[in-house]
Regions:
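Rhodanese-like catalytic fold shared by cysteine-dependent sulfurtransferases
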Residues: 1-28, 35-81, 90-129
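Short, surface-exposed ligand- or partner-binding patches at beta-edge/loop junctions that are enriched
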Residues: 84-85
Length: 129
């Protein structure tokens, strides 16, 4: 199922995501891992919307939560590139499929996920006390 799903999504390498991260301060990256995973190590500015809650939380993204109507938030987000990351790339691919089902098109799954990001030595943050 995951291999089939990955064939239907656009994957981006962590090197390319890092370039975009440096170039665009308002880059939309969503970490779909569970909160415990996210708190341990994450990409700065990535928002944590776990896979199981993604469709319900997407309209609350900080870049669009100024809208009073959920439809306006979803419309604005659907016009932007959105990069989804998980542990190794599987959950982000499944998340893309879910977002495509509600009308999103400009979606990218981070190939190799956080593991690839960490392996390349790119900056991370931790939210553990």
């Amino acid at each position: 199922l995951i291999a089939e799903t990955k064939n239907k999504v656009i994957e981006i390498k962590v090197e390319k995501l890092y370039e975009k991260y440096l170039e665009y301060p308002d880059l939309i990256s969503i970490d779909v891992r569970e909160p415990e995973e996210y708190k341990t190590v994450a990409i700065d500015r990535a928002v944590n919307f776990p896979r199981g809650m993604l469709e319900m939380k997407i309209a609350q993204h900080p870049l669009v939560n100024h809208h009073c109507e959920i439809e306006h938030s979803l419309q604005e987000l659907s016009e932007k590139d959105i990069y989804l990351i998980c542990g190794t790339g599987a959950r982000s691919a499944l998340s893309i499929q879910a977002l495509q089902n509600i009308g999103f098109e400009k979606l990218y799954s981070v190939e190799g996920g956080m593991q690839a990001w960490i392996d390349e030595g790119y900056p991370t943050v931790s939210y553990l006390n």
